[in-house]
Amino acid sequence: MPTKAGTKSTANKKTTKGSSKSGSARGHTGKTHAPPSMHSGMLYKDMVNIARSKGIPIYQNGTRLTKSELEKKIKRSK
């Protein structure tokens, strides 16, 4: 298989340039896979809404609670 080093390197350069360019220009459209939040049953937004309705504080010492922390608190309050 006679492959020239020159053509190979230029091809590689082209692909990397193209993908990085289109990715930065388009933002999130380049992502084909769903974000991790889409796979889980409950979204973070849902958790926050449940916590609010139950009167559970979402913020703890100045920072927002993580999804798992909110989940624990919601389960405890049931």
From Swiss-Prot:
It is found in: Virion. GO terms for cellular component: virion component. Induction: Expressed in the early phase of the viral replicative cycle. Keywords: DNA-binding, Late protein, Virion. Residues 1-25 have a biased composition (Low complexity). Residues 1-41 are annotated as: Disordered. GO terms for molecular function: DNA binding. May play a role in genome packaging through direct interaction with viral DNA. Binds to ssDNA and dsDNA with the same apparent affinity in vitro. Belongs to the asfivirus P10 family. This is Structural DNA-binding protein p10. The lineage of its organism: Viruses, Varidnaviria, Bamfordvirae, Nucleocytoviricota, Pokkesviricetes.
